[in-house]
Regions:
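Active-site glycine/GP-rich loop and adjacent strand/helix microenvironment
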Residues: 1-149
Length: 149
């Protein structure tokens, strides 16, 4: 392992995804961030939630560890009957976006399980809806754009 310390630690690393088929090699988000900070000398490392099926929809993680919706994208959480869940109730993540115009990708029901924690009250200070991704539906097909195996 080679440690590369950047001369200027004001950079920000944004990372996301890539563990679907390589789940046995997966490390926690916290461990990954700490390793990047240690090896590169960066102070800010943020995860994001997004998918190739809805290009342009990127939900950035705040410093409190939550993903935030933007002006251009939103999420809904649905139960097993596809009814809307209440805040702080886990269910399937449905992503909504204004960005896709060349294909019908404005609304995608994912196989990811998530929970909306609140709206306009995240401790990071950012307004809007914020949420967590808890995992995937059991027995869902493990695939994704980042799979290389």
């Amino acid at each position: 392992r080679k440690k590369i310390k950047l001369k200027d630690n004001r950079g920000i690393m944004i990372h996301g995804g890539g563990w679907k088929k390589m789940y046995k090699l997966k490390v926690s988000n916290t461990k990954f961030k700490n390793e990047v900070k240690q090896h590169l000398g960066l102070k800010k490392v943020h995860n994001y939630y997004g998918m190739m099926e809805q290009t342009g929809s990127v939900f950035l993680e705040c410093e409190k560890g939550y993903f935030h919706c933007s002006l251009f994208s939103d999420i809904l959480i649905r139960n097993s009957n596809l009814d809307l869940c209440n805040t702080k109730e886990a269910g399937l993540i449905q992503t909504l976006s204004l960005l896709p115009v060349s294909y019908p990708g404005q609304s995608i029901l994912t196989e990811d399980i998530g929970i909306i924690h609140g709206i306009d009250n995240c401790k990071c200070g950012k307004l809007g809806k914020y949420f967590s991704v808890l995992g995937r539906v059991p027995d869902s097909e493990l695939r994704g754009c980042s799979d290389v195996n």
